[in-house]
Amino acid sequence: MALSSIEHYLSYHLRVLLPQVLSSKSSHNIAYIFALFAAITSGFVSLISLYAQPWQEHLSYSSWQINMIVTVINMGMYLTPPILGIIADIHGPITLSLSSVLGFIPSYAYLAYTFHRDHSFTNESDGSFTPTLVCFFIIGVATSGLYFSALITCAKLFPGTKLLSISIPTTCYGLSSLIGSQFLRVKYFHPVDYPYLDLGRVFKAFAWIYTVIGVMIWIATSKVAQIQHEADIMEEQDRMAEPSDNDVENHYDDNEQSRLLHATHAQQMTLMKVFRDPVLYIFGATIFCALGPLEMFIANMGSLTNVLAGGHEPAMSSALLSIYALTSTLTRLGTGLTVDYFNKRQLSVKWILLLFLVVGLVTQGKIYMLSMSSLDHSHMVTINRKLFYIGIMQGIAYGGLFTIYPTITLMVWGEKMFGTAYGTLMIAPALGSALSCLIYADVYDSECANSTTRSCIAPVYETTALEFCAAILLTVVVTVLWRKRRTHI
């Protein structure tokens, strides 16, 4: 497909410049490396779990406000992929990358400015909290846009190998939390006059980082446009070299038009079949119940750690996020390998899904038991060890489920309908995380704000445990319905 006018103008200068300064192979490899850097930085929004303390102490945000921020981020990330996919298909990944950078830079610059203002002017009553929500919604959309742009770029640069096109960029995205949490340990972000993370400096640094990333992904996506443009030229030359006959050509055009109309009608019928499939929505309900609590854990990791550890381990949140991110990334890779093994052995991958759901359920029980335990501050080593194990188990559940759900979607609805089906299903974690985060905020603000006991948070994990039980039950129902349809997973 020829370049759109937007993709043509955005990539024109680099398409002209790259062949003059780099060989084709060098520009190809550099573009891939730049796309991986974009994939790594696209996930920095997950560091929000480290922002709870400065938001609460410096800006006097309540847990409800913090979870509202998390909710709008998830809405931006999960509700827009179908639209972003259409834009990328029509106008290329360069359009997504430019839009993402234009979303990141001013949003983070504004957030840095508001954090450094006097906290007396940052209360919700003066209306400044609403622009903050708008900024984080834009950041959520930009996160999906930059990640999609990087992923599509890698896939187009190395379409022949799943390792380079899918696995490595996906792994880089999973490493965002780990790399970002280590980056925020730099002393620059912890000035002596701040007893907590200076989010003004953090957000300002992010604005500069995304400026650099914007240049890098512009180069990478322009290389993709160059490859497409060269392919279009070769196709045009081949077509002009063929002998022409007006009658044959007209007959061919009529048949081609008829074929395209038939294909369009068939595609519309297939789309309607997907949207009318009740099993799709039951499957979406399992995602709603499972991924909602896991997203909530990431968002509230800082405040949860303070509640469970009594606020005596300020470095625990960062360490917990690091181990969580590492475990999640390794699980994503391991799950992909396990799925390949199961497919070769003709084993059902539903057992992998059920295993991760059980791990998630057990983890909710572990958090509940720790919240109800009688361990005091003299047992901090034991408490920290339990939190460490909880972080590992949550990472396994999160990484595994976020890998197995799209895999099953691809197996059931096929490659042609994958984007439509999975884009629809991605609404579920957005709604699920919104519900779970607001439940957490309500319990935290009403029970834990003035409490010194960790049991105040227990009602949240009674609810999340029930959600995982529902997810397991609905998964069994879905697999039975698929078996009746002779759909094997």
Curated annotation (Swiss-Prot):
InterPro entries: MFS (IPR011701), MFS_trans_sf (IPR036259). GO terms for cellular component: fungal-type vacuole membrane. It comes from the Eukaryota. Keywords: Glycoprotein, Membrane, Transmembrane, Transmembrane helix, Transport, Vacuole. The chain crosses the membrane at residues 30-50, 68-88, 92-112, 132-152, 163-183, 202-222, 279-299, 307-327, 351-371, 388-408, 421-441, 462-482. It holds the Pfam family MFS_1. Glycans are attached at N123, N450. GO terms for molecular function: transmembrane transporter activity. It is found in: Vacuole membrane. It is a multi-pass membrane protein. Probable transporter. Belongs to the major facilitator superfamily. This is Probable transporter MCH1. The lineage of its organism: Eukaryota, Fungi, Dikarya, Ascomycota, Saccharomycotina. The gene is MCH1.
